[in-house]
Amino acid sequence: MAAFFPPSSAELRKVKRVQFGILSPDEIRNMSVARVEHPETYENGKPKAGGLLDPAMGTIDKTQRCQTCSGTMAECPGHFGHIELAKPVFHIGFIDTVLKILRCVCYHCSKLLTDTNEHSFRQALKIRNQKHRLNAVVDCCKNKKVCAIGGEEEEEHDLSKTDEELDKPVKHGGCGNVLPKITKEDLKIIVEFKDVTDESIEKKSVLSAERVLNILKRIKDEDSRAMGINPDWARADWMIATVLPVPPPPVRPSIMMDTSTRGEDDLTHKLADIVKANRELQRQEKNGAPAHIIAEATQFLQFHVATYVDNEIPGLPQAQQRSGRPLKSIRQRLKGKEGRIRGNLMGKRVDFSARTVITADPNLSIDQVGVPRSIALNLTYPETVTPFNIDKMRELIRNGPSEHPGAKYIIREDGTRFDLRFVKKVSDTHLECGYKVERHINDGDVVIFNRQPSLHKMSMMGHRIKVMPYSTFRLNLSVTSPYNADFDGDEMNLHVPQTLETRAEVIEIMMVPRQIVSPQSNRPVMGIVQDTLLGSRLFTKRDCFMEKDLVMNILMWLPSWDGKVPPPAILKPKQLWTGKQLFSLIIPDINLIRFTSTHNDKEPNECSAGDTRVIIERGELLAGILCKRSLGAANGSIIHVVMNEHGHDTCRLFIDQTQTVVNHWLINRGFTMGIGDTIADSATMAKVTLTISSAKNQVKELIIKAQNKQFECQPGKSVIETFEQKVNQVLNKARDTAGSSAQDSLSEDNNLKAMVTAGSKGSFINISQMMACVGQQNVEGKRIPFGFQSRTLPHFTKDDYGPESRGFVENSYLRGLTPQEFFFHAMGGREGLIDTAVKTSETGYIQRRLVKAMEDVSIKYDATVRNSLGDVIQFAYGEDGIDGCFVENQSIDSLRKDNTELERMYRHQVDKPDYGDGWMDPLVIEHVRNDSLTRDTLEKEFERIKSDRSLLRNEIIPSGEANWPLPVNLRRLINNAQKLFNIDIRRVSDLNPAVVVLEIEKLVARLKIIATADTTEDDENFNRAWAEVYFNATMLFSILVRSTFASKRVLTEFRLTEKAFLWVCGEIESKFLQALAHPGEMVGALAAQSIGEPATQMTLNTFHYAGVSSKNVTLGVPRLKEIINIAKQVKTPSLTIYLKPHMARDMDRAKIVKSQLEYTTLANVTSATEIYYDPDPQNTIISEDAEFVNSYFELPDEEIDVHSMSPWLLRIELDRGMVTDKKLTMADITQCVVRDFGLSLNCIFSDDNAEKLILRIRMVESQETKGTDNDDDDQFLRRIESNMLSEMVLRGIKGIKKVFMRTDDKIPKVTENGGFGVREEWILDTDGVSLLEVMSHPDVDHTRTTSNDIVEIIQVLGIEAVRNALLKELRAVISFDGSYVNYRHLAILADVMTYRGHLMAITRHGINRVETGPLMRCSFEETVEILMDAAMFSETDDVKGVTENIILGQLPPLGTGSFEVFLNQDMIKNAHSIALPEPSNVSYPDTPGSQTPSYSYGDGSTTPFHNPYDAPLSPFNETFRGDFSPSAMNSPGYNANKSYGSSYQYFPQSPTYSPTSPSYSPTSPSYSPTSPSYSPTSPSYSPTSPSYSPTSPSYSPTSPFYSPTSPSYSPTSPSYSPTSPSYSPTSPSYSPTSPSYSPTSPSYSPTSPSYSPTSPSYSPTSPSYSPTSPSYSPTSPSYSPTSPSYSPSSPSYSPSSPSYSPSSPSYSPSSPTFTNKYNYQPNNKKK
């Protein structure tokens, strides 16, 4: 449509709200343009008027115009028609609601049946949800039999009435008629009058839609509202179809089959049926046909109208085409994955995209993508023509559409578009400013690259284009892991962003280097892989030497090489360089100590024999071989450290250069793996054969043992299970032993081993399978089962349990498998394939549900996490407000220390004579001893650390785990400070411990997750809640800071000087602020992906716990499904029962508890039951029992009359083992019989120590039944027997089928002296759950006992407990196979499921029952039902969520769309206009020849010039930030969140440019601050330009650009605001023309002769100046006086840090003029 209206610059209004409702018959008629009366579509080859393709409804012919709007086929959107139905019919979507309404109102007078005084009705009126309200009103009216009578005047409720009067049936003005029972059958509504005496009224009749319509029409509006139906939008009578709208032909297009015939759409067929049925009904009515024929015709019309809307009605035949294919109704068009909502609105096919196969190219940078030239010729980017690029655009247009780089279209300002393929006239290619040129994409353009399935955020990333020959996308190898791509034929998609805003977002948020560290598990997702990883290990070995020619070639592959060749490690006999030396050139300035994967822990730390300890100091690799642990995507790897210390750009360079250098070296060295690498020597092979044969013999012995019943069963397992487990143990051990002996035989230079140790491919299991033995094949976790007459294959004998016949493969892959081994191996492999296929679909659906449940959860600007309704999910993201990317594992040192250790580490024992020796300045010692205040401070500090420790142990981390992911790696910061300030660990520090304590206190107080304004809220509770949230957020980190920077440790362990310590404090603060999560971040989607992605890697099956207990545990995907579906019935319900401390350590006592809990019936302990006819109770016929029967009757029970006993005897023999195991006695069991049957049974039992345990039970006849016939006694006894066995509970808790005991020796406890130890406890696991009853057992520790049944926990313990249980269960499922997901993602899922106070399942029954908008709900599941409900109950959608906005094609309020940008119009008035250069001599840094760093990342726009440090209301778009300046691009510490910038890339404040720089001339005609890619370092900036010269007279520091009146350096400029630390209007020596002038530094002056460029302090012209230099210039683009954050890797300082001297902007730690002692102002924090 857009093509047919002239373009307007006016912004489109956003849709604020969507109101749903039902069209009334009048509305349908009014909007209709034609009444459809004929089923035919054509007449004489033309569309028939009044037919289904009436020309008024829109044309379907290219040559015709529409009769209604005169538009052509392309322009006319179509217009509705209508069909007048002869009789009203039910609408299938509304019929259930109509039925409910009929049950609420009187059949005769349409009054609401219930009375307004009724309590239940009043409660119903309070329900906000209209649908629920209707259901509640239906419940109120359910039991009404009569429409109550009464005068209208009594409607007003008289409050003076008494309760009794009120309770009487109130007369509410009904008609008094009897009400029928109303039911629905298929499409009919049936009324049934139950007790009608009148013969004239039929008891049961069909209620016609006409009659229903009349009833509904009479309903009053207020009654309607009471039922939840809003008469303004959806009256009840509109739910009956009287007029049917006919959709316009464009909705149901027809296709030409051949020249004459047309194929009509399904809807057109259906409408034709409706029209035919309607005509037939009209004809019958006209002819006065009998009622039953009319009813039949109506029913036929009803059927067609119903199947037109929904063709899947249960109980109705489907409407079909002639071919028998069911027609696609309106409902089928909307629902499901391919339907309108999900298929065409939520996800669409898009333009400007490409897809092809990917191949590898290690010479590309990780953020590049090689694009085939053919694709680059086809994809375009609309570039607006400006004076700066007009020449370039003309050149592109000259190249035309078929030559790259060229252009495809020109779009004029009025919107006309010229296709350059067909342009005839030269005048059409004329360009003016403001036109748009659709140019080909070119090197350096940013694109989005994606590989499906997009399981996590890193599946779509921004890349820069590199146009290359041939037809595949080229990709760096390191990027394959986040995409999960390989090069075996994978295809990937590329999308070209079309606006500057989008490009800016891609560059600032999505680029690959920014995604290196993933928030999912706070570790890198990209590392060095494949050849490079293998090469790196070989390259950094001790014996890797290179000659000069190779070194020179390698240096060529190092783009960042500074031109200095490192001195050779070996000079004689010839010069040789080591690999470590060259690798050091790549490593940025970091400090790191790590171990390789093959490190032996027994080695001494200082010296590693196998070179397995990696030491990097200041970027020099001093020792260690680099393998996957150091270079891979691991936590704490080099990549992780570089990313955190130096930012994404340095990290990108490191990965790129490692690949180019190492690959080049590896090509020269060569690497190959042949079959020879897998062949072991004969001695090893003999060893392997021996191992396997001995294992086979062991299995034989086991079989013999089992057959001779000499087998000890393990508790809870049968003989066969125990046997299988033992066999498995033996065989697996054999495989491992054989494998390890094969591995040990491999020499160091074995190529296979090289790959495995480097971590680039393969594992040790692969080696052992290739060389030694493939091992046992399993199906469903067991050995190959018997499938053919008690054997696995016909080739084996029956009942062969030996290794070979049950799937043990003793050959290696090298030797080859025998046929039967091959077959078993294939069985095992097939299972894996099936498993994967099943798993993929399941996890895909889980992920979709998770995303739909959490898609609208985001961080808001008050640091809370909320959904689109504004419900608070969390008060602070992850409870600490930190972004998952910025946390690293750190250990809290004080947690596990005992009291003596704690005192040694943290307490200042001032009075000891040797206090401070060797670590404190004697003057300071004296001061501390004599100053009571200091001593007080230090003692308080120790107490604080102690209280921290007890808080940690008792509340925060009772488990005693000291390693936690926390922001700001403190240990590394200390290391860096020691290196940076040259701290000698043997020297004493000049610090006063009290200063340390005070500084740390101030620092901790400043660490806030949100800069709180004074809360204006008067609400005490509100403020208290916020205070608690903020306190909790930083509590753990504060404890970490306090325990690490305790004054004694700073002085003894770290020996920091005052300067270094203050630097560290500043760094902590700035890094903490950088680690905060950004508002607008969609943490819900992130959490869903972080949980869904590992689920894809999960195993599907339930595994047995290896080991003793046979407790089954559901794990993997099925368990995850149970948790998020909140399954009522868990597959393996189980309790973990902890006992009270005195019981827990005693096995016998634990056994007693076990037997008390286990549910035991008589059947469990019975071995046999028999029924005898034994007529004489005193002398039994069973000889075995004679003894104890006689002894019983010697002392008979008085009450028992022998003669009343039945002659039939039930004799139960008990299983002695079970009875003793359950700790029962015969008396206990008899007691239970008496308890359940009283005196009607007589029970005699043998002694507990008798050989057999016997119960003898007889019936006792009561007085009344005496003497009656006893024939059926034995039958009765049989029934009693079965009842006793199954029902009679001896002891235990119902539901707990079995209890298993196990010990846990990892239970944390605090020892006597305050240390942290572990103790062993007996723990009970149950099969079956009954939490409440178990917890009430006196010996059970109810505080620790848990259940894995989530529904049970909420019933017993409530919502907070359930949240914790959910977290625990999710963590268990995910960590089972070694994955790790950061807590914050699991927490969001748990919070989303519980925040409403009840459990919300992640299914349609949970997600779709929340009060979100109908559009959002219908995009998940139950699409049509939800939309129908929305219409009936006239719901509104506020369009706040993600889905609604996407459906409406709007920018959703997320990420950069969650705020607006204002334009400061006053500043525009002051803006300078710039003289535009003549188009002819503009130079283009964008031409492919010149790869300027600035060009590589973006382009500019001509916004008014302004200062980059403005207030947020500044005249610039949000598109670009200051980080775009060429120097900031590699700015190590740049953080997108905190630095402001402007929409062009170059500013005068860029560190590469400075007024003192001789190479800049402000009057040069080809320089303009808004030049899109101007960079003074750009090689294409022509030095021969006449006005460009270092000595050029036109350069003058007072040029209008830097004059005091210049807006960018004027005293009113915000970058020199009076609050800026370096500005003081009264300072006599301050001059706005010298931005780097520092009044307090006498030795600093740009012209000072003693100032040398190699001086460690700052010089803008110095070649060695770099953003990573120790001093950071205040003119750097990411520095802003208002910005609390600074460069994370900058060794220099952050402006808000206390030691940053405000009067010394060019502070440098090594500057001799710096003295902190005088101008140290800790409180200089910008408000």
Swiss-Prot record:
There is a cross-link at residue 1266 (Glycyl lysine isopeptide (Lys-Gly) (interchain with G-Cter in ubiquitin)). CDD domains: RNAP_II_Rpb1_C (cd02584), RNAP_II_RPB1_N (cd02733). Mg(2+) 2 binds at residues 486, 488. It is an enzyme of class 2 (transferase). It is found in: Nucleus. It catalyses: RNA(n) + a ribonucleoside 5'-triphosphate = RNA(n+1) + diphosphate. Zn(2+) 2 binds at residues 106, 109, 147, 175. GO terms for molecular function: DNA binding; DNA-directed RNA polymerase activity; metal ion binding. Signal peptide: none annotated. GO terms for cellular component: mitochondrion; nucleus; RNA polymerase II, core complex. Keywords: DNA-binding, DNA-directed RNA polymerase, Isopeptide bond, Magnesium, Metal-binding, Nucleotidyltransferase, Nucleus, Phosphoprotein, Repeat, Transcription, Transferase, Ubl conjugation, Zinc. Gene3D superfamilies: 1.10.132.30, 1.10.150.390, 2.40.40.20, 3.30.1360.140, 6.10.250.2940, 6.20.50.80, RNA polymerase ii, RNA polymerase II, clamp domain. Belongs to the RNA polymerase beta' chain family. This is DNA-directed RNA polymerase II subunit rpb1. The lineage of its organism: Eukaryota, Amoebozoa, Evosea, Eumycetozoa, Dictyostelia.
